């Protein structure tokens, strides 16, 4: 256990917490491991055992946020709402979370967007999670005969491709000035009608 009295996971969590604060206050370009280590109360060498470099620390910040988002989407998947409403809510939450992150935490969003453009492993895991959750929903919709004209796999693929500009981080940022939830909602509704939904 480090001399701070924190466990290894505690050091990691504290470093992430302090990094979030520094990004908010100064921008992610100004984050330095040596400064974070000093605030945590460990040597920068010790902090390297948790984060190989600055990029790894910034990735940990974004990964934590995406993990929270994945959990929100999972709660939607498991909710008692009708299946069409869950599919709709899934896409709206995915879009809304990224848009609000950019509006309220622009510097944190910049760090996330940078990782996203590089398709870091944790980004790929998030995308796989989103696809798996949606496939579960489309399979349920198929069983309920709301999707009858295509397979659940094809419906999942078409929904993800059609809604890409509402969920891709850089495109969300570029269209930040517009409230596009209505367009997204209408798009999902049109696709579901095309798949055989009432």
Describe each PLM feature range.
Residues 1-10, 80:
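N-terminal intrinsically disordered/low-complexity leader segments
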Residues 2, 89, 132-143, 161-162, ...:
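C-terminal peripheral helix-coil segments that are non-catalytic and often amphipathic
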Residues 60, 74-100, 156-159:
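Hydrophobic alpha-helical connector segments
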Residues 98-118, 168-171:
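Amphipathic alpha-helical segments used for helix-helix packing
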């Amino acid at each position: 256990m480090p001399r701070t009295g924190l466990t290894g996971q505690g050091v990691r969590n504290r470093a992430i917490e302090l990094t979030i604060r520094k990004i908010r206050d100064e921008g992610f370009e100004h984050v330095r491991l040596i400064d974070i280590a000093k605030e945590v109360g460990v040597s920068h060498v010790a902090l390297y055992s948790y984060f190989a470099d600055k990029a790894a620390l910034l990735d940990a910040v974004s990964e934590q946020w995406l993990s929270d988002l994945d959990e929100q989407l999972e709660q939607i998947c498991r909710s008692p709402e009708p299946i069409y409403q869950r599919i709709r809510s899934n896409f709206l939450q995915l879009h809304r979370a990224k848009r609000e992150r950019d509006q309220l935490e622009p510097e944190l969003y910049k760090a996330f967007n940078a990782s996203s453009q590089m398709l870091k492993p944790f980004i790929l895991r998030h995308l796989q999670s989103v696809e798996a959750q949606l496939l579960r929903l489309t399979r349920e919709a198929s069983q309920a005969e709301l999707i009858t004209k295509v397979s659940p796999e094809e419906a999942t693929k078409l929904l993800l491709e059609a809604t890409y500009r509402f969920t891709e981080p850089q495109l969300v940022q570029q269209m930040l000035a517009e409230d596009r939830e209505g367009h997204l909602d209408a798009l999902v509704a049109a696709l579901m009608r095309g798949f055989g939904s009432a």
